[in-house]
Structures are given as C-alpha cells and as structure tokens.
Amino acid sequence: MGSMDDVTAYPRLVGDVGGTNARFALEMAPMRLAHIGVLAGDDYPSLEAAMRAYLAALPPEIAAAGVRHAAIGIANPVLGDQIRMTNRDWAFSTEAMRQSLGFDTFVVLNDFAALAHALPYLGADELEQVGGSTCVADAPRALLGPGTGLGVASLLPTQAGRFIAVAGEGGHVAFAPMNDEEVVIWRFARERFGHVSAERLISGMGLELIYEALGACFDLWQQGPAVRRAADITAIALGEMEDTAGDHARCRYAVDTFCAMLGTVAANLAVTLGARGGVYIGGGIVPRLGAAFANSPFRRRFEDKGRFSGYVAAMPVYVIHAPYPGLIGLCAAMDHAVASGH
C-alpha cells in the first residue's frame, strides 16, 4: 500500500470501480468531493489507463500540485497484491500500480466494503425506508446491491464504539427458490449455468434471465421478444419506454419476481448477521425503481421467514439514494487505514 506518512494531505483520489463504470473524485477536505468523473470501463484497457485518463483531465493547478494518496473500491474480492476483476478483463498488482502512478499511498478494497464504510455518513434524505421500525444504533448492518453483479458486505460494531466493514462474496451463495414458479426459473438457469448463484438471478443479467425464462417456460408470458436488455425491461415496466411489443405486463412481472427474489436473499443475510441496525440496498437497479420497489413483493417476501417472521419484520430496510456513496465510503476507509496503521 505504500507509506501512510502525511496521508491526510489533500487532495486525495477516490475511485469506485464497478463492472460497467468507474467513478472518480478528489477529496479536497474531509468528506468533501469535487471533480467527479464517470468513465465507461469499456473505453479503457486497464484500471491504470482509466485512472490516468481521469488524472490527465484535472485542472492544471491540481495536476501541478499532484495527488499523493488514493483509495479505490473494486467489484471484486481483494485477497492480496495481485487482483483480477470478476466482471471485467482487468488485472493488476496494487504495488506495481502505486509505483507506476507515483502515489505514496494506494488502498484497494472491495467496492461493497467501501460502500459499507459510507453507511454512518448517509443523511436521512439519502435513505428511503421500506418497512420495519427503527434501527438499533449499535447493531450489525447488512448491505447488498444488485447491479452488474450482486454485491454483499456488512458493517459490524466493535467494543470501542466504532464499526468494521467486512467484505464478502454473498452474491455467490446458492439461490433458493421459494415457490413453484421460481423453481421453474431456477431450473431454466441451472440448465444454462449448472450452479445457480443468487447473482445469476439478482443482478442486471439476472433480470434479463428472469424475463427470458418467463417467455420460454410459461404460456402466460409469450408476448414480446425472447430476450431484452435489463435497462429496457426496467424502462418498459416503469412506463418510461414505449411498449411496442406488447410485453409491458411481462416486464413488470419480471421486475416484481426479481424484487421478490431479492427479498429472500436480503432476509437470509439479515438473519445471518442479526442486522437489527438495518438492511441497506445499493447498486444500480433498485434505487432506479423508485415507488415500484416499495410497492413490489420485496417486503412481503423479506418478512416471510416462518418462525422468525416477527424478528425480521422489525428490521428496517433502506434504499440508498446518495449520488456517490461508494466514494464517501472510500474517504472513510482511507481515514480508517490511517487510524489502524495499515
């Protein structure tokens, strides 16, 4: 990671790198972001190339002063120096990139661990509560979010009154269908992929797969093309895109099925962690759904936990609507690295 000496010197570079886009910003002062840039991952052969493009576009006065410290969150496990991204053909050595870019400090962590760091800093106007009561301040918090994949992390309290962000790969747990219809969709996915993880169905590609399975396996949902892009399914379901193929009902049902499946996975995570501090949903899909998510089967499925239905019914679920929460989390993660001496 390099030296932590004078790591509070600003500006500090933060970057949230997902499977589709890379979002960069400069932290000019504690938790104050500027020069936010969103770069399409497909436009760059490597993470370093994307970072160089962002740095090259900074105002001359900032470029002249230089950026010495950086923290990057990536949609991938971070298990050592060598990193190969799961949803993009980028691979790099953290130390080699630090040296190549001339940083004194270069922190790399899982993107959902970075987002977990942000949870204590999100304002009430950046969170939409979907059911439950009030959160318990010093209890574990669960985090998940469907986008290109399905990110999962947690924020756990310590005896010192702080929180520790824990990265995980919970998106790759085996998907468990909850009714006969979901069994049919699961079988459709299993024939194609073998192992059916939660991410196979609860992600952008998962929404596409659900839509495809509905048309392929159920007479009721024959209208429309065999396959559609996730963005189009969502837009048609929300009435934002013209329904020229007559499959609005199929798109809406695909979204509702997706939300119900997410409710199952979110509840499993909540009871595993004892997440009385709340369950937080980020990613690119759910915040986009707006009221359609609140009115979906999500909460009903979330509370469908048999003997533990009362336990999860009290747990609040929050949809994150902050514009760049991962970047705020990276600022906090950099501070945490300084405090812990790592």
Swiss-Prot record:
It holds the Pfam family Glucokinase. GO terms for molecular function: ATP binding; D-glucose binding; glucokinase activity. It is an enzyme of class 2 (transferase). One of its GO terms (biological process) is glycolytic process. One of its GO terms (cellular component) is cytosol. Its EC number is 2.7.1.2. ATP binds at residues 15-20. Keywords: ATP-binding, Cytoplasm, Glycolysis, Kinase, Nucleotide-binding, Plasmid, Transferase. PANTHER family: GLUCOKINASE (PTHR47690:SF1). Belongs to the bacterial glucokinase family. HAMAP family: Glucokinase. This is Glucokinase.
